Structures are given as C-alpha cells and as structure tokens.
Amino acid sequence: MIPNTRYPHVFQPLTIRGVTFKNRLEYAPTVVLKCSPEGEVTQEMLDYVAWQAKTGVGYLTIGNTPVVHTDSSAWVCELNVTQDRCIHGLEMMARTARENGAEMSVELAHAGRGSNSTPGNPALAPSDVPLNGGPLGYIKPMNEEDMAFVRQQFVDCAVRCQKAGLKIIMIHCAHNNLLAQFLSPASNHRTDAYGGSLENRMRFPLSVLKAVREAVPNMVIECRCSAQEDTPDGLQLEESLQFMERAQEYVDIIHISRGNIFFNYGSTYTIPTYFKGRQLNVAFAAEAKKRLKVPVAVVGNITSLQEAEEIISAGKADIVVMAKAYMADENLIHKSIRGHAEDVRPCTRCDWCGNANNYGTSMRCAINPMLGKDLDLTTLVKPGEEKHVMVIGGGPGGMMAAQTLREMGHRVSLYEKSDRLGGLLNDATVASFKEYMRLYLQWDIRQTMACGAEIHLNTAVTPELVEQVNPDAVIVATGSSYVHPPIPGIDLEKVKTVSDVENHRTPVGEQVVVCGGGIVGLECAVMLGMEGKKVTVIDQIPLEKFADGMPVFNHIELNHQLEKYGVTLEGGQKITSFDEGGVNTVDANGTCHCYPGDAYVLALGVKPDNKLAQTLLSKYAGGVYVVGDCVSTGRLLADANQEAFHAAIRIR
C-alpha cells in the first residue's frame, strides 16, 4: 500500500454519472494504427490497450475513431466502430482495459475536408475550403441530408460503444475536424443557417452532441475542443469558450486542446513540437474552469505527475491528459508515486511516435523500445546463464544496450573513447529549444552510470583489447563523426565545425553561412538566428529535401522558426571552395555564386565510424552486433535505441 501523500489531488477519484475513475489522469487520444486495414480489432491492438491500462491512468482514449469508416477516416488501420459486427472487438478492448485497471473511451470523429476522397466520393465539409491553402481537392459542402446522415452516424457509433460495455466516449470537436470545421470561420464560409454568426456555426455541432446525449443518456461524454486554432481567421478563445458553455448542456467533461490539424503551423499545436513550452493549454483550461460547471480536462506538453498535481491543486483543471509522457515511460506513474520521479524517462518531443501515422505504420517510440510490449526483461536470462558483454561506444545506442543488458542480468563493460557519455547527442542538445532532448540525455547518462555496468571512459577500443577482455558478445555502437570533405579552403580560420559553433567554443561574427540543409544545419541556423545573426543556409540538395526525414509536425515548426528568424535558404548549390570573400558554389545550370560571411559553419552530415565493426565482424563468426550510426549514414536516435535494444535481448 502506498499512502496518497505526494499527489493527493491527482489520486482523488472522480465520479460522473455513477462512473468512478480511480484518479484524475487520462491517457490522451492517440492514433496507433494497430487494427486490421478494415478496422477490426487485432491481438496487437488488445495488447496495446492492456499496455496503456497498465500505466495506471484512470481511463484511456482510443484516438480519432471515424464514424463513417470508409468516408470519414484519415488513416488506414484506424478502429472501426461503424457496424454492429464491430461490437465484439470493442467489448474485448473495453474488458481488456478494465482487467488491467482502467476504463476505456473512444474518440468519435469525422475528418470532414481531411477525409479520404475521390471524384465520385467527395469529402463532406461545411464549405469547399482546401487543406493548407493547397488545391481544392474533392469536397462537397454539406446539405441538410448530409448533416442528418453524419449526425446519425455519431449516434449509431455511440450506441455501439455503449453496447460493448464502454462507460465513456469522446466527441471530437477540436483540431478542425468536421464538427470544428463548422465552428471555425476559417473553414465555414456558409451563408445559410449554419454559417456566419457563432450561433449559426454552433448549430450543427450542438445538434450532434444533443442527439448523442439523447441516445446514450447514461454514458459519460467528453467533448474535445480547440481553445484556439492558431490559424488565420480561425476560431479564437472567446468563441470557443462560448461554444463550451453551450456544449456542457449535453456533455460531462470539456477537454481543452488547441490547433488545427489541416493548417500548417496550426497543426504544430495539435501534437506540440519540441519548440513549444510546457503546459501549453493550461491557461486556456483555467479560463474554461471559470465559466463551466462540468469538469475540465487539459492536454498539451504536460510531462509529469508533479505538474499534474500543481494544475489540479490550483483549480486550473480537473483531469490532466498525457500521452507522449507515458509512451516514453510506461512506468511514469508507478515510479513517481514511489518517490522515484527522477528515474522517469523524459519524452524528447521528437514526434517519431506521431510521424508513424504519416507513413501508415503503427505507433512506436524513439527512446522506448518497450512501447506496447508486455515483456519482463528480468525473466529473459535464467540464473547462471549470464553473459559478459562488451559494449563499445557510449552514445545513445551504447547506453541503451548497457541498460537493457544489465536489466536482463548480464555483466556489462562499456567503453567510450571520450571523457563523457552521450556521443553526438551532446552537441544536439545545446540550443535553448532542445530542452526536452537535453533532459533525456541527462537522464540517459544518469541511468547508464547507475545501472551497474563497468564504465571505461577515455578508452579507445582496438581488436587487441577485445581479444584481451574476451567477452561472450560485443555490441559495437561506435557512432559517427562529422564529415570534413577535401574542399579547397576548408582549413581557413573562418570555417567552423557545427560542434564548435553550437557549443559556443568559437566566435562567428554577425553574418554566418551554414553549409548543410540537414536537421543539424537548420537547427544550428535557428539557434544563430535567435542570437540575432544574419544566417544563410546552403546545400547541394533541393530546398524540398532540406531536413528530409524529419517528422512532419516538427518539420513544419522548424520551417516556421527559420522564417521567423529571417534565415535565408539556398538549395541546389554545390560548394566548390571557401575563401575570405565567402563560400563559393555552382548551381545546376553552371552559374557560380558567392555567399559572404564572417564564419562558415560545416554541417555536411556524418560518416559511420565502422572500421572496428568491420574488423570484428570479419574476425568472429558470431556474437558481434553492430547498432546505430556506425551501421550507415542517415540514422536517427530511434535507430540507435531500437537496434541496441533488440541486439541486447538476443544475447541469452
């Protein structure tokens, strides 16, 4: 038994319509894409629901569940609740959640103008307003018959949820999905009874909420709202609050979010990026609390139980909603209530989890390979069968390997050639806007130092040392080093490494040319722009390939920051030389250019440090595992962590 002393407000039960939630924590709606292409419940989906419930939340919400599976969905493999045959799978999910300690909700949604559409099957929307200012696409402005049809679909899906044993559902009125499209002046250009004034724009969404309430009078209904859309001419706080005041007649919880999934910069608030501050929507929730009678839930860059306790105790919200924090560490609640909050793995806000949806793949995490897995590492190795494993490299991959191996019970010797752990992540976390990644790095180093591995710093590993140590297995995680190509003038004093610049080890003057349009170069450019420098970024690749591979919402945010700080981007420029006058380039047409500056920053990518790996792979028939950047170029933090974890659990 654990006394409720650390977080007394968080663990105060909440009863609504006879349904008691054991605490004030909700696992936020997330799109996990673990159902079949037809939306049928799979064993993988059931396992994921069990994993979510075991986090310790009061209830979890399955995100973005379309009310018209073929026409209103945004992704393949979303949960299908649109036919009675789906009730069986829903019931299994709800039962699985309850058996593992949580209630389960489903977020009923219609993507409106963002739905999958074809010429013969256009997307339904209040008006024919295109997405992100792009081409119109196939959109049909809804008539009364369309509205009646969609309203009935919300009702029918809610009834199926009730028949499946769910006690709570969510209606998605946020992020410029269909109901929010009616609310927003940016997407509702109608001139009839459903457009123009706020009263008219509320008419259809309120009619849906009213119909659902009448159909399921005993269910708890949560309504998700964007406090503001962060979109030109979009919904603002005051009108949103007025809608919430009207909506509370039909719903039991108002859930405060923010943003517009269908407008570039507005989308960066729906799934907040690493540039966003903490507790993004708490001030909005506090305003809602002043005007609403029903409980208020709040989501958005909330990362800990301590924050949740402070929010609830201050009366700013009744329920605190998180998702990424639990994805990063499913034991966040359990560690925190036992007084070990410092051991909670912090989310980096890299959005590798959300980006999976854009590629049609299921949910995953860059720093937590255990996401969704019911796996006890301590049981994988039988007593007496422990191995001695040599881990070479103290970057993210090496640290993940060491921690995983130690949890399995193996003896671990970790070797790092420099005087500190972290590898190139030390450079990647310097900028002020990299706080979340910096906290993760600090956590990773602490956990590695405390895991019981033998740590050998300032030790370069050779094949002879491996032979001398004579381990049972070796994990090579030697990482990569910055590219320093043989370009004329590259040794000039004006030419700086991105590492030296980011760590402020060298002056750069007021005008800077960053050579490299990858993520590292562009983040360096933003950092310099924040410091008031005039920055130009050049690369041989075309502009559309700048920061290629970066998760979508963070990419949008990064482009916004580059524009905000006046960074000039020049693609298609091959560097031919450096001189005192500038960086000399030639474009695809053969035209020469010169970009002057006080400093030229090299951010031309990295190359694998794989010489040792190749030697060991050729010398030993087995027992050598190669992970992370030393495998190939173009790797991410996620690659290092995932590969190191899976290499470690293969050693038994």
Question: What are the language-model segments listed below?
Answer:
Residues 414-450, 527-573, 631-634:
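Rossmann-like dinucleotide-binding cores of NAD(P)H-dependent redox enzymes
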Residues 299, 368, 458-460, 498, ...:
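Conserved beta-strand termini and adjacent loop/short-helix elements that scaffold enzyme active sites
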